[in-house]
């Protein structure tokens, strides 16, 4: 399951992170919930946790702020694809 999560930082900058199976596995381990419960159980902390871990994975070993400090830089969280790809109409 892939879930795009767009983070808007206090600076106004936005970044979209894709929560993929590694992030979901960490979420399951951290929360004790299973992926089948995600729809009912996902809250703001969960979304930031998933985005943070996707961000960390994308940085591939480059140091990132600790989770708690990183959360303090966020002004908004947007779930899903805000700009879905346009599809061509059939002729």
Ranges and model annotations:
Residues 1-15, 25-45, 49-91:
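Charged interaction scaffolds used for protein-protein
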